[in-house]
Regions:
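Bacterial N-terminal signal peptides
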Residues: 6-15
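Bacterial Sec signal peptide processing site at the extreme N-terminus
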Residues: 15-36, 45
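Start-of-helix signal in alpha-solenoid helical-repeat scaffolds, especially tetratricopeptide repeats
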Residues: 20-21, 54-58, 115-122, 200, ...
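N-terminal amphipathic/basic membrane-interacting segments and domains
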Residues: 25-29, 60, 152, 158-213, ...
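Structural motif corresponding to the intra-repeat A-B loop/turn of tetratricopeptide repeats
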Residues: 33, 70, 135, 220-222
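Amphipathic alpha-helical segments of tetratricopeptide repeats
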Residues: 44-48, 84-92, 149-152, 156-157, ...
């Protein structure tokens, strides 16, 4: 029995700003051409030049993903470790970060360092788990998957904190801002920033990470099949009750009833590139005599590429892949949650 699914996930894990898009032209060209060796070499050079820049985190993440694609697993682990360390540093300076973001809205988003979004952290740990599985280090892989699960929960708290801080920073303009938000013209402008989602997995949920964690729980960890089946049932509902998850649940049920572990082959397709953040200049009325309006750069997601169908052919048998995660949807949901704080 074989299961094939594809993950609408990108080598470009992050959604950088306009300046980053310009910087990555050669890198993206190599990746889109399937030249992962060239892509990893370009990422290495960019990290050497820009590891301490505003785009340092994003380049370390790109480097880790490119090296992994080029089968340089140990080097990929090191790159991701550096990225994680940098993101933790930014997280420890949360109060400073909030003030910087508030100031940047009056200027432009390029002035703010890219510190990593919640989905970056989750995918970092997920890729690290895959790296360790590649090296046969099961315990290390389980640690990364548990951390990825914890990061999904932590992002709920981070987002609530961001929105609360943004509201406090509004200060005396709060009533004017509410009036602005309720005006028809402004509402139309702000609605144009909302991403279009084909799927909604819920706040800060990555179904692929959850599935991989459940898979490792029942196949690698001792006495974790019950936890795995709980996770699989949650994923089953999140994805709209797909057949392959239903069959996965049946397989784990058999194990819980004393059956043997089945011999399975899982084929994972990773396709596409992540959406990128564009800056849109909007003139927003504030209904204040001293500050009648403000011109600011607001972020808007722009999807890139289009979905592809994937399949595996074994002899005369063709097995079509099923989508388990669209990163466009994961990133778009995160973006939707972030917008109230920005606005």
């Amino acid at each position: 029995m074989r299961w094939i699914f594809h993950l609408g996930i990108a080598l470009l894990l992050m959604t950088g700003c306009a300046s980053y898009e310009r910087q990555t032209a050669a890198f993206r060209g190599a990746w889109n051409a399937g030249n992962v060796q060239k892509a990893s070499e370009l990422a290495n050079m960019q990290v050497y030049d820009k590891s301490d820049s505003h785009d340092g985190v994003i380049w370390l993440l790109e480097q880790g993903a490119a090296l992994r694609a080029n089968n340089q697993i140990k080097e990929s682990i090191y790159a991701f470790e550096r990225a994680e360390k940098r993101m933790r540093h930014y997280e420890s300076q949360a109060k400073i970060r909030v003030s910087k973001e508030a100031t940047a809205l009056a200027v432009n988003l390029e002035s703010v360092p890219y510190e990593g979004r919640g989905y970056d952290r989750v995918m970092l740990n997920t890729y690290q788990a895959l790296n360790y599985l590649h090296l046969g280090q099961r315990d290390a892989a389980m640690v990364e998957l548990r951390q990825a699960s914890d990061e999904q929960d932590a992002e709920l708290i981070r987002n609530a904190r961001r929105i609360s801080s943004a509201r406090k920073s509004a200060g005396r303009y709060r009533s004017n801002i509410l009036r602005t938000q309720n005006s028809a013209g402004t509402r139309n402008q702000l609605d144009s920033l909302q991403p279009s989602l084909n799927m909604d997995y819920g706040a800060f949920v990555n179904p692929f990470t959850d599935f991989l964690h459940a898979l490792c729980l029942w196949s690698l960890a001792d006495d974790q099949s019950e936890n795995a089946i709980v996770s699989l049932r949650r994923i089953y509902q999140t994805l709209g009750q797909p057949r392959f998850i239903a069959d996965e649940i049946k397989a784990v049920d058999k194990i819980l009833s004393g059956g043997k572990h089945p011999d399975l082959t899982y084929v994972i397709f990773e396709i596409g590139v992540a959406p990128i953040r564009k800056e849109v200049r909007l003139d927003i009325p504030l209904f204040d005599q001293e500050l009648p309006y403000v011109t600011a750069e607001f972020p808007r997601l722009e999807n890139r590429g289009h979905p592809l169908t994937c399949a595996v052919v074994i002899g005369k048998n063709k097995i079509d892949a099923m989508v388990i995660c669209e990163m466009d949807a994961v990133i778009g949901r995160d973006f939707q949650s972030e917008l109230p704080g920005i606005i």
